[in-house]
């Protein structure tokens, strides 16, 4: 029935329609993102919760419950009693905590224990056994690098010696021990406060000669210790 009253029908503008649609979509996206964040928080281990890490340590299988915040250095020394890996600077600058992870030089102070999952880890305590398994151990049952350090008096206080030896093994394996200058360059990530560098270089060159190393590679220079450790960088690429 027409009562004579004028009526105006409402028709939304194009701008109003788009604005409303965008606001609705934004609200839905925000809700979805909030749900994702809540799910991630729910899956995250509670503070202080331990995680299981399975790896090989000096040829023996290990499954350990570790604090995700704990470093490999502390795990090896305090958890496993392998005190040959030394505490130095805890900043990746001295090389005293050098270990091998999947054959590469890695600083224990910059590596989380949880990163060792599935890895083969060798410390100074396992080096002689590794040499024996490879058929290169000396008559005294030492790795050739260990024997060369003894013969050349390549230490004084001895605190840095385990890290020096662990780096030297990699430097030799990668073919960077052809001269004293080259040894010094590729061993530069390891500091010796007693300044036994001439004897250290001589020991590395002697061991390289005895082992007949000819391989080529990246070496153990300090620049390779910074950032993501090499054994893990490749897995994450």
Task: Give the residues covered by each predicted segment.
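Signature of N-terminal electron-transfer/Fe-S-associated modules in redox systems
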Residues: 2-237
């Amino acid at each position: 029935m027409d009562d004579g009253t004028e009526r105006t029908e409402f028709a939304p503008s194009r701008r109003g329609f788009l604005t409303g649609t965008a606001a609705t979509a934004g609200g839905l996206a925000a809700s979805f993102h909030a749900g994702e964040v809540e799910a991630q928080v729910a899956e995250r281990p509670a503070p202080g919760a331990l995680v299981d890490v399975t790896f090989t340590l000096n040829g023996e299988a290990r499954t350990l419950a570790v604090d995700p915040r704990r470093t490999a250095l502390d795990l090896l020394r305090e958890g496993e009693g392998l005190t040959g890996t030394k505490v130095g600077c805890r900043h990746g600058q001295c090389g005293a905590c050098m270990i091998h992870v999947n054959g590469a030089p890695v600083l224990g102070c910059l590596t989380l224990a949880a990163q060792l999952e599935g890895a083969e880890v060798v410390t100074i305590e396992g080096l002689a056994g590794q040499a024996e398994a490879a058929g290169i151990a000396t008559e005294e049952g030492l790795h050739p690098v260990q024997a060369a350090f003894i013969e050349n008096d390549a230490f004084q206080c001895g605190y840095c010696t385990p890290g020096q030896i662990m780096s030297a093994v990699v430097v030799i394996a990668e073919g960077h021990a052809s001269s004293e200058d080259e040894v010094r360059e590729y061993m530069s990530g390891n500091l010796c406060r007693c300044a036994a560098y001439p004897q250290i270089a001589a020991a590395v060159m002697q061991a390289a000669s005895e082992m007949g190393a000819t391989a080529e590679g990246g070496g153990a220079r300090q620049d390779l210790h910074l950032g993501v450790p090499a054994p893990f960088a490749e897995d994450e690429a």
